[in-house]
Each structure stands twice: as C-alpha cells, then as structure tokens.
Amino acid sequence: MSDNSKTRVVVGMSGGVDSSVTALLLKEQGYDVIGIFMKNWDDTDEFGVCTATEDYKDVAAVADQIGIPYYSVNFEKEYWDRVFEYFLAEYRAGRTPNPDVMCNKEIKFKAFLDYALTLGADYVATGHYAQVKRDQDGLVHMLRGKDNNKDQTYFLSQLSQEQLQKTMFPLGHLEKPEVRSIAERAGLATAKKKDSTGICFIGEKNFKEFLSQYLPAQPGRMMTLEGRDMGQHAGLMYYTIGQRGGLGIGGQHGGDNEPWFVVGKDLSQNILYVGQGFYHDNLMSTSLDASQVHFTKEMPEEFTMECTAKFRYRQPDSKVTVHVKGDKAEVIFAEPQRAITPGQAVVFYDGEECLGGGLIDNAYRDGKVCQYV
C-alpha cells in the first residue's frame, strides 16, 4: 500500500451519502482525513427545525464511525455576499441564475479550499460525480463522472487549474447505486438518507414564496407575440424560458389545443410572452453569447474551437463552434437549440473532458437577438 498517511485530505461533508462515502474511501486508502461541515445558510424550516443542525449530526455520526476528526465552519457571510446576492441580482435582471455553479466556484472550491489549506490540507475532496486526471506535464484535466446520470461537471465548469490541482473526486469512477451499497455495507448512518434536491438554500420550500421574501413581485400582462392579452403574470422572475406549467392558460385561447409555453420576456415593459407549441419559433435559436467565460487551463486571449456543449444540466451534448475573445464568447450551434436561457451556464466538452464554460447572456436567431430578458 502506498503511504498516503502523510497526505492530508479535507473532505467537505454535507451529511449526505455521497460525501460520507467520499470520506470513508479516503480513510480506507490510508489518507489523513478531516471532515468539515460547511454551514452556508441559516435555514430554519417552517417547523422551527434547523436542517443544518440535523445534517451536522449526521456528519458527526459518520465521522465517528469511520474514525476521523470533524469540524463545522460557518460560511454564511461569504455565501450571502458571493452567491445569494448574485442569485437575486440575476432574477432582478430577468435572468435565471444557476447558484450551484457559483457556489462551487466561490464557496466549495474557494472559501472552503482556503480554510482547508489553513488546516494543512494537501487536497480537498467532495462527493461530486466528476473525475480529475493529471497528465505527464502535471496539468489536471476534469473528466465527466462515470455515472452519466449523475455527472456534475456542468456545475464544476468554473473551476480553475489552481483549484483542480488541489481537488480529489473519489466518487468519479463509481455509479450512484455502488455508492449506496458501499455506505450500506459499511453501516454508515447516512446509507439510507435520501438525496437532497433543489437549490441548497431553498430546500423543500416553495420557490415562489421564498423568492417573494427577497424580491417584491411585480405582476404584469401576459401576451402573445401577436399582441393578444392572455391575462396576468405573477412577476417575471417566477418564469423561465421554455417553461410550460404555472401559466394558468391551459388549452384555452388556441384553436389547436397545443400547450402554452413561456417564449419571451420584456423587462422594460414587464410583459411575459407566451406561445403555443414545444418547438415554438421564438424558443429556437442558432447562437448565443456568453460572459465570464473561463477554461480549466490557460488558453490564448482569442481563439476559435469546435467542441460540444451543454446549455443545461443533464442535457445531451450538442455540436458547437466557439469564438472566444477574453472572457466573452460567441457560441454557434450546428443545429438550432430550444429554450436557451440567459443566466444559465454554457459548458464546453471535448469528448469526456470538461473544458470550462461561461454564463449565457443572450440567444440569437439568425443573428437577431431573442427577446428573453
């Protein structure tokens, strides 16, 4: 057995099964493991139970079982300043943000990594489904997780080479059922715990109610592109491009009984545009532009590449041509794409490798900007 005992790995433990098994595997491989619970949000639920307290109890139980020290660290201020303020600003601007991308970039692999280094960490590890491979030049490449259904490189696309150099993803070569069975075989306290879903700071709460606590809703008119008034919308921030449910229109108003979708927004007029048909013309675009474009390794200031891309999590890859200039990019699609949503991440791949990504600013149809914000 290689002597890993001199290598300290600090594991981000959430109280879930994935991070529990991450800590277990590293401990079994002989590393000097420390578990850290990050408290990023003050989240008392409607029954007055702080879910973070429950999760921390699970971290403590698992850490005791596998015999590692554990601590809790509070990143509520950093999370509020670097993730939540961004989340609200994006909604104010009529966009649909992806807080998980920002949380990984700013908290899990920045604030947490910085903290871990003060504990003498050689590496940090998380329960993400992704893989890191080091080439002969010492460059770290981020590859998709083996479990295609769970691959999380989309959310990790803003990580830098410096961050990846210090990162381990022990679950990357496993599929989710294998992770559960490892937890069950080891009798871990979290083996049967269900996966958390949704945005971390909202949890099981109603999204509309949550958002309205921070941003006052501004109801307005719901219109077709032809100018027909379809009623009132509850506030542009509650709707995302391509959304079907929650419009309150049903099959009415249309002669062909096709379902209705959100096909555009006009922030200045506070109008929500709706139209019939999954592939409504206004939902289809041929290119996008992105900002905050970033790659996992150093790239030229200006270049063009052919690769594949994802425009949302768990979507099949699409072929694209990317023209990069500084931290901006124009992405041209080989085939028209549906519901490209400003605020979401566009992530680039070369085969199994995640190259990086950016945040979508606008979608275009044959050179003309789509009215999505």
UniProtKB/Swiss-Prot annotation:
Q: Which domain of life is it from?
A: Bacteria
Q: Which organism is it from?
A: Streptococcus gordonii (strain Challis / ATCC 35105 / BCRC 15272 / CH1 / DL1 / V288)
Enumerate the active-site residues.
Answer: 103 (nucleophile), 200 (cysteine persulfide intermediate)
What protein am I looking at?
A: tRNA-specific 2-thiouridylase MnmA
The organism that produces this protein has a lineage beginning with: Bacteria, Bacillati, Bacillota, Bacilli, Lactobacillales
Which segments does the entry list as coiled coil? none
Q: Residues that bind ATP, according to the entry?
A: 12-19, 38, 127
Give the top-level enzyme category: transferase
Question: What Pfam families does this protein's entry cite?
Answer: tRNA_Me_trans, tRNA_Me_trans_C, tRNA_Me_trans_M
EC number in record: 2.8.1.13
By its UniProt entry, which CDD domains does this protein fall under? MnmA_TRMU-like
